[in-house]
Amino acid sequence: MVTIRADEISNIIRERIEQYNREVTIVNTGTVLQVGDGIARIYGLDEVMAGELVEFEEGTIGIALNLESNNVGVVLMGDGLMIQEGSSVKATGKIAQIPVSEAYLGRVINALANPIDGRGKISASESRLIESPAPGIISRRSVYEPLQTGLIAIDSMIPIGRGQRELIIGDRQTGKTAVATDTILNQQGQNVICVYVAIGQKASSVAQVVTSLQERGAMEYTIVVAETADSPATLQYLAPYTGAALAEYFMYREQHTLIIYDDLSKQAQAYRQMSLLLRRPPGREAYPGDVFYLHSRLLERAAKLSSQLGEGSMTALPIVETQSGDVSAYIPTNVISITDGQIFLSADLFNAGIRPAINVGISVSRVGSAAQIKAMKQVAGKLKLELAQFAELEAFSQFSSDLDKATQNQLARGQRLRELLKQSQSAPLTVEEQIMTIYTGTNGYLDGLEIGQVRKFLVQLRTYLKTNKPQFQEIIASTKTLTAEAESFLKEGIQEQLERFLLQEKV
């Protein structure tokens, strides 16, 4: 007969009791009622927060945007093709965040910060919330350092400062992306981290931008965040916030950053699509009522930080596309009112061969000459005035055939000044080259040349001054001022090159 050993049994029971885990895990769950068009309606999830991430049974992540009395409206961060009606959903207790690190430089990622360039995983030890609050008034200081774009028309007349938000606005095919990418190219050696956010564009266009940045060595200091036209609306809506979070990471580490949103019209359309599918009431142009807040909370994150926070900066260049030049549509007026100025690109100027096609008349920088070095202020004031007078005279001269000599001279000068503002794509100029170019035009040295000769002469002049009068560039670079000494070097160089050029042309 088997003997029952009571001590052994009691030991086993004691062990079992000691191993018993009293912890109770409470999971906030719900059931899928309906799914489709990137939207899911969930029953349950009673304690979910607005903006909280939820996870579906098959792994798709969504964001709870609409909290209604009997269901929760969730936007999906994927295609959601495997989600079934009746399947369970659980709240994660987190809000959207992304990993951030220096390793992202030179990479192409999507809105969830996953690499899409086929070059392996990106290591990151820190993370940042995709939507974080903008710096407050005390955390900022006024914009005072220039951010050079390398484009004469912008740096002289519509200057951009570090920490500013300058809108680039125009019809399709007017060179908006070209202005933005040229600005990235010009940051080489300036210790500025660039983030280019492509929203709802063709994959081929994004590939073209990435290739041109790689060819010129600009990807070393650039991160590209891309959500193409075939991406879910949720990801197109999130992409700009992801870019801003990456730029903020560098800004708070006392670095200067430049972020380009290309373009916010497509983000607004993606948000409109999500809102209408969630049955939020439509407003003007069928956009939801909070579309202004969509852009304002994004653009307010651009700032020039105070000296206590390390003087880092985040400069934003949002791009907005207009329909046949209508700047008074809903999204353009919203973004104009949020930003510190706008660069307006005109299709008429573009077609007339004036490129970059910047309409100087209605473009403006609300930071103004605070974002220019002294030498640029000295030469740019005269340029603005002469171009404004030229625009007025040109309109007037169309009605009058017999003009006096002074008016004819002024028109001729204006045409040459307009010519010197033309620039090829991907050929940014240093600030010293811009100063010498503007000085040559405003002081009448180009008046004796034919309009067709102006650009050829200016290219040769820049090369000549670089090799024969390097002192000019050294003085400007060190003092940031057009001193009498620098001016004399510049005058000598222009006179010598002008004589050589005219001789060459005669021959």
Swiss-Prot record:
Catalytic function, reaction form: ATP + H2O + 4 H(+)(in) = ADP + phosphate + 5 H(+)(out)
Residues spanning the membrane: none
Family annotation (CDD domains): ATP-synt_F1_alpha_C, ATP-synt_F1_alpha_N, F1-ATPase_alpha_CD
Xref: SUPFAM superfamilies: C-terminal domain of alpha and beta subunits of F1 ATP synthase, N-terminal domain of alpha and beta subunits of F1 ATP synthase, P-loop containing nucleoside triphosphate hydrolases
GO biological process: response to cold
Entry superkingdom: Eukaryota
Cell location: Plastid, Chloroplast thylakoid membrane
Keyword flag Ribonucleoprotein: no
Keywords: ATP synthesis, ATP-binding, CF(1), Chloroplast, Hydrogen ion transport, Ion transport, Membrane, Nucleotide-binding, Phosphoprotein, Plastid, Thylakoid, Translocase, Transport
SS bonds (residue pairs): none
Family annotation (Gene3D superfamilies): 2.40.30.20, ATP synthase alpha/beta chain, C-terminal domain, P-loop containing nucleotide triphosphate hydrolases
Pfam families: ATP-synt_ab, ATP-synt_ab_C, ATP-synt_ab_N
Site entry (Required for activity), positions: S363
Sites bearing Phosphothreonine, chain numbering: T257
Binding site for ATP: G170, D171, R172, Q173, T174, G175, K176, T177
Job of this protein: Produces ATP from ADP in the presence of a proton gradient across the membrane. The alpha chain is a regulatory subunit.
Name this polypeptide is given: ATP synthase subunit alpha, chloroplastic
Source organism of the structure: Arabidopsis thaliana
Top-level taxonomy: Eukaryota, Viridiplantae, Streptophyta, Embryophyta, Tracheophyta
Gene behind this protein: atpA
